[in-house]
Amino acid sequence: MTPSVNTADTDLHTTVFVLVHGAWHGSSQWAATQRALAGLGAASVAVDLPGHGFDAPVPSGYLLPGRPGLLTERSQLADVTMDDCADAVLDTLRRVRRYGRVVLVAHSAGGGPASLAAERAPELVDRLVYLSAFVPAGRARFFDYLGAPENSTAWGQGLSLGDPQALGAVRIDPLSPDPVYVEELRQTHYHDTPADRFDRWRSALSPDLPLAVPATPVILTAGRWGRIPRTFLRCAEDRALPTAVQNLMIAEADRAMPGEPFTVRTLPGSHSPFAARPRELAEALVG
């Protein structure tokens, strides 16, 4: 049986799932999951965080032969803040609240903006779902968990390009012509997605994650974020954010905010179930 988020206390047809992507992704990567949700009778809307999706700016040499400046050109997203990202989530939450119950779902680095949005307006969220996502309740910055010993087995150490501080972004090269780099990207984030399909997924990624997303502290309180029921969907074979660090975030959040401890479920597979098993993911979300 597919693990599920508890929606037994409500009519699914009055629930809206708000989906927040992670680093380098966009709303379009949720499309297969949204189709599966619709088939199950659930409404959903996917958010594009600032600097992501089809409007994402790219370095000037990104599509040119030799990729001039890719390692050094400062990102156009360098001035994007965590507040900007949370505002994008809040705007969507406010627009859908009138339709009924709202479940806010965050993947990976999207956990920071989603958490801050929930902290600012807990009345707009009925349940939080973290899909192998950053939970700032125990440690305020995503970098604090990425640098933890529990994350030492993570893959993808060779993916980041240049100096993030100088670039103002964590930059990768989804369109790299280097097959070794491309395979590292696939093995890190999409290892259970067939290689021929992965080329389509990587072509939709954008190169820059605003540095503010992993570097900005997100301060949560028990009276606001901590009062919202929450679920963590672990990805069992996650190579980008190993289960050890997922478990660390869960444990530290529950110690810091014990009033609404996590309901924990486990999905099989990689960091990106929206690519490899969208129907299973949808079933886990709706219950």
Predicted regions and their residues:
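Short, surface-exposed "cap/lid" segments of acyl-processing enzymes
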Residues: D11-H13, F17-V58
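Active-site nucleophile elbow and catalytic-triad environment of alpha/beta-hydrolase enzymes
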Residues: R200-R224, I228
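Flexible "cap/lid" loop of the alpha/beta hydrolase fold
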Residues: V129-I172, V213-P214
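Active-site loop/oxyanion-hole signature of alpha/beta-hydrolase fold enzymes
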Residues: L49-V103, E119, Y145-G147
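Post-His helix in hydrolase/transferase enzymes
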Residues: P273-G287
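Short beta-strand/loop motif that positions the catalytic acidic residue
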Residues: F232-R234
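Conserved hydrolase catalytic core segment
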Residues: G100-D144
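Conserved loop-alpha-helix segment in the C-terminal half of the alpha/beta-hydrolase fold
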Residues: A236-L267, E280
